[in-house]
Amino acid sequence: MSWRNLVDQLPVEFDPGLTDAEVERAQQRFEFQFPPDLRDFLQTALPRGPLFPDWRAGDDARLRDWLDGPRQGILFDVEENDFWHPDWNARPCMIEDALSVASEGVKAAPRMIPIFGHRMISAEPHQPGNPVYSVHQTDIIYYGFDLADYLRHEFNLPDRAAWPAKIRPIRFWSYFVQ
């Protein structure tokens, strides 16, 4: 995959890509590892704009809120819309207990890393080719079968590949798109 070729086609402003040290600093600061394809993309060029996370110089509080968005959205649906994930066993009767179980359940799930707005990719498994999701509370859908497909989809580029017969399952998150 030539990330430079794809970057050159995107109608997005870019800064120079992240250095190895900047990648390591972001990963340590926020306690996750970029999947290899996202890391390669971000090291080719760093997208710029209000809907892109700024892993180089972005506000820590804003980035932490963005990273916590999927958990907060799911907790909202647990409290307001009676959502309950089957991995969490029986739902406690008291809402405070249900929220505690749900919060721990989401924390145990693979970390979702923002790419653009509420489009996110799982940090696990740590290999290229994880699907990209659109995540809004428990309204979660695929938005690309991998990072390159997602970017072509999001920015209306031609030559999108056909969807594969099977998209890599991601622990916990694949439940929402079944």
Regions inferred by a protein language model and the residue ranges of each:
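Extended serine/threonine-enriched, polar tracts that run as long, contiguous segments within proteins
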Residues: H118-S122
